[in-house]
Amino acid sequence: MNIQALLSEKVRQAMIAAGAPADCEPQIRQSAKVQFGDYQANGMMAVAKKLGMAPRQLAEQVLTHLDLNGIASKVEIAGPGFINIFLDPAFLAEHVQQALASDRLGVATPEKQTIVVDYSAPNVAKEMHVGHLRSTIIGDTAVRTLEFLGHKVIRANHVGDWGTQFGMLIAWLEKQQQENAGEMELADLEGFYRDAKKHYDEDEEFAERARNYVVKLQSGDEYFREMWRKLVDITMTQNQITYDRLNVTLTRDDVMGESLYNPMLPGIVADLKAKGLAVESEGATVVFLDVFKNKEGEPMGVIIQKKDGGYLYTTTDIACAKYRYETLHADRVLYYIDSRQHQHLMQAWAIVRKAGYVPESVPLEHHMFGMMLGKDGKPFKTRAGGTVKLADLLDEALERARRLVAEKNPDMPADELEKLANAVGIGAVKYADLSKNRTTDYIFDWDNMLAFEGNTAPYMQYAYTRVLSVFRKAEINEEQLAAAPVIIREDREAQLAARLLQFEETLTVVAREGTPHVMCAYLYDLAGLFSGFYEHCPILSAENEEVRNSRLKLAQLTAKTLKLGLDTLGIETVERM
């Protein structure tokens, strides 16, 4: 149920009947304060200006044409021309009933699209670090939300599995295998990469061999392809452990690394030349873009092939976008890549559009994000100043959550405690990130994220268990409740019901904007409204069975909404805390 969309259409028709143009925008918003109703139409200002009349005068005319019978109990004009809409309690009750009768809580499915989501993208032969956290979990929230809404979602893990460094890595793997007489495990990927680089820098004979190996790998030599595959397999096996711990939905089947696009690059360059878009400049192949200017104010040259014949990330990104449209048949492509890559992506996409590889009707969207910072406001590092491994961060989260949970539940069995600590610890790390606007940097703070008050995972998980405890005390099952009517008489009942029915609107925003913090804010607000409702509207000690069952149904929909909302964020819920 999308009340915002319903009201938008009703108000728009009334505006047109009052003389507004057919493309008028009612600007329906959820009201910030209860005294302004549940929704507010703010579009009279802009339209009245076009019509040369006072906004309040237009609002009065709109009201004469606006039929919200059965939807709103009161509609009033406020200030210079805002229209405040108060939803009818009977309308709220009816739609709470409908939401409870639906597995999807009444959420409609929009027209199905094929949506490619590019996220996570770690590098081969390197361990995942905290810099991979945001892309991985924000992207996964987008995937979960879009899939719930009914879209066909293709996860694209754009792994860094190609490039000149692989000659060095294969040469070092070969040396390690010879010295260790047989198979070896890359237990310490970071150390492996570091040692390979050290040998490459210090041993000229090793470096020469590495350079030869690059040529052999790129020419398709089977031995070197096999060694390369081994490096990819070991890395992705380790990464899968991290993905599973993080409760993200990526699997090995979602890997679409740089190597996938490598065979396409010569054809891309040749085609761009044939189209007259790419030209030779100082030995390199360059595309000049009018939309980007250099310091002299001239069109900026974007190199797609170097003098030595090597390709660049831009070339790969051009091939990648083309592949996603032509082969994967994407209707929309979302990229969860940090904000530092923005200009690079814009240049690649400008070439893609110019060449006609992806039509303008297919959005290519950079859902960029800021950095994770330490308490000092600088990029999050270890005490020694090194990069924090993601696995180490999750280990610490688990340890801290374990202590916290044991303190609150000293008699809890060990296996139950471990399960709860995992849900709380991993949930805390994810929620702390997801609850911040992705476009900004944020401060990583253990104390804040593990707190049981405020907009945190432990608070949200506890809020969910608190609602469930009402049902345990009521000793009533869902089947018994199903036939009971919902009756809304109290203001707090109406406020809770209206917020519950805004779940679909929240999902729609997250799906459109890729902003998980909107869902976090909604769930936190919902938990707060339930708390006020629980305090002021007795459930188990209600004046009669009819009121008791009605309030139980509001509690039931609250629990289901909290659980489903947290699930779209990849946050586990627990039955008891």
Swiss-Prot record:
Superkingdom of source: Bacteria
UniProt entry keywords in alphabetical sequence: Aminoacyl-tRNA synthetase, ATP-binding, Cytoplasm, Ligase, Nucleotide-binding, Protein biosynthesis
One Pfam family it belongs to: Arg_tRNA_synt_N
InterPro entries per record: aa-tRNA-synth_I_CS, Arg-tRNA-ligase, Arg-tRNA-synth_N, Arg-tRNA-synth_N_sf, ArgRS_core, DALR_anticod-bd, Rossmann-like_a/b/a_fold, tRNAsynth_Ia_anticodon-bd
Location(s) in or outside the cell: Cytoplasm
Annotated family: Belongs to the class-I aminoacyl-tRNA synthetase family.
NCBIfam families reported for this sequence: argS
Protein name, per record: Arginine--tRNA ligase
Species for this entry: Shigella flexneri
